[in-house]
Amino acid sequence: MLRHPRCTKCRLCEKECSNKVHHYDATQKIMVADDEKCVNCHRCVSICPVKALKIARTNCTYRDDDNWTNQTIKEIYKQAESGGILLSSMGSPKRMPIYWDRLLINASQVTNPPIDPLREPMETRVFLGKKPNAIVRDAAGRIDTSNLAPQLELSMPVMFAAMSYGAISYNAHKSLAMAAQQLGIYYNTGEGGLHEDFYAYGDNTIVQVASGRFGVHERYLNAGAAIEVKMGQGAKPGIGGHLPGTKSIGDVSRTRMIPEGSDAISPAPHHDIYSIEDLRQLVYSLKEATNYTVPIIVKVAAVHNIAAITSGIARSGADIIAIDGFRGGTGAAPTRIRDNVGIPIELALAACDKRLREEGIRNDVSLVVGGSIRSAADVIKAIALGADACYVATAALMALGCHLCRSCQIGRCNWGIATQDPALVKRLNPDEGSQRLVNLMTAWRHEIKEMLGGMGINSIEALRGNRLMLRGIGLTEKELEILGVAHAGE
């Protein structure tokens, strides 16, 4: 922590920092910072009235070693002291290939003129759910829609991904709900139930059923526009969830229907699901509970045999499959699992779309993907690889003020997002937060239209699975084969 001499010793940084980094030394009459406590959230830097603070990389590092890195050494020391599992938050920061950045989008030139989105209509709406294999007409020749499966209608192919009430604050949830309603998209409750105040946003809400069944009851199931069964999460495939008792207080515990102060532990498996047949029973139980009026989503992590898994899920009766990739975010996960388990969403998506098409069941389900969707360009590339829509979470949190300090698990978020401390929660204004989310998604929608028009395409549906619109660069032949795209120049 670097402090400029123009510091006025107003002590605002001391007041704003929940990690107790700053304090006033009355003896020397100066402000002092404890660098070991700093999580790099930039709260103090942002609020300093004279811009006297700057966070810089420390020079107090171990000798350079590509194998035994500074982080590795610190983690070994920490485990030697505690004997515990290392916990981390957000998505994996490891230097793994980011395939979005190795894919380039096509553009029309000369023979296939581009479309100007400012002057021509561009369709960004998408419908998620099972589609008919053929158009059916009634006796009068009109299209018969009476037997169509329930659909989610989105104004653009983006939704706010699952983040539970408890993992994030009341004000963060309210911001997401308000923005989803204004945008004509959906937000996901996560596995912590739905706060009583947010039932009013039910038409733009996806309610989630996870292995812990927290906050699940008949009214909850019928409150949303869709139900998502969480089988896995990209940041921690194969394990359950854990909300510490320090966050399970007040409305959080009441919403989850658990004793206040108790840890909310979701088991690794659903104890009633050990096969596709078991999953089918739950899917149809949920359909019965909602009188077949809402689509059922099954969410899984992107793992090694994901194509075969999605093939089974498509046959379970699910209407939508959500796939969460290796870089997906989380409020807390074991570090070793977050950084070493699962596969990138780009490869998983391409493999699943191909498998479902080959088996002739692609129209039976919609595919929604998440796991580090960072921009409108990532959305376009995902659609071209076969997705119907994308989940975003980390980008949405950044719009709310998250500075990616990766300390969600400690519950002292200085921006009022990943905390239940009332003094910190009130730092996030839901009205301002929802407007920032609306601004972000509006900007993405404009960019999506621009890129579609540049390709000479006027609808999302025309782009879905159209891998001719993509070219790879710097990828191996095997990677190109799995992605189903040609190399740049071909």
PLM regions with names:
Residues 1, 21, 30, 36, ...:
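Conserved, well-structured core domains of diverse proteins
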Residues 43, 175-182, 278-285, 312, ...:
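Alpha-helical scaffold segments in soluble metabolic enzymes
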Residues 156-161, 183-185, 203-205, 225-229, ...:
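Structural beta-strand/beta-sheet cores of well-ordered domains, especially the beta-sheet scaffolds
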Residues 227-276, 281, 288:
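Active-site cores of enzymes that catalyze phosphoryl transfer or operate on phosphate-rich substrates
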Residues 9, 14-15, 19, 24-30, ...:
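Glycine-rich phosphate/ribose-binding loops and adjacent secondary-structure elements
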Residues 5, 9, 36, 40, ...:
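Catalytic cores of large soluble enzymes that bind and process phosphate-bearing ligands
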Residues 57, 63-110, 330-346, 354-366, ...:
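Conserved active-site-proximal phosphate/metal-binding subdomains
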